[in-house]
């Protein structure tokens, strides 16, 4: 499987661990990622907050570059990039809007632009959770996780066209395939951006109340709010690890820690990792004891 790849700007800096673990997981699953040549920023939130035409022009340029390279689909790990790229294509169905966008570009966009999908969608819908489960070498048994999607991955539904907008399950299903226990989490699509950090704190507190050992995300901005600003959000030290779903996937697939970027997390995942190791050791010891019992009976 091959895919044109749009990394997004945050993957080059604040969410480098997401970028690193995404590439590592895709390599392990033999999903080829061909980075779009000369890609540029999609504008993120500031661009579309200022000017919809400018925002669409920034995204359309990247889609046009992918089209010129023969791509039919573009994959990106970042929900903000995903939303901008998909929204640009959606708006450019209107000829008058497309003309305004093309007026800002050196080269007009083709009428048919590639489809944009999230890496999460590719893993769930194209690769499949059953196939992922077959690749697991180190099951995530013994841990409970709360999957937090944020507000962009599946909304607005008519543009994103992925998962259930109110109760998405893609990450839940992947975590289950990896052997983790997924706790119920009614705040999974609430926005984590709040000037007083009240909602961010509420998300973390509810995850803890439901028994989660970690919060799993697929969004760099969500990760920053829940990990970097955790102390501010909860008014103290909660020590709730917040990991990208690709980091836990890589761990379950048996990939080296250095390929997954655990060292970049603000809240240390060491206790979580020890819990996984302990569950594996207990399982191995139980299997060895059963084997010894069977031998004794023989």
Where are each of the predicted segments found?
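Iron-sulfur cluster-binding electron-transfer modules in prokaryotic oxidoreductases
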Residues: 1-298
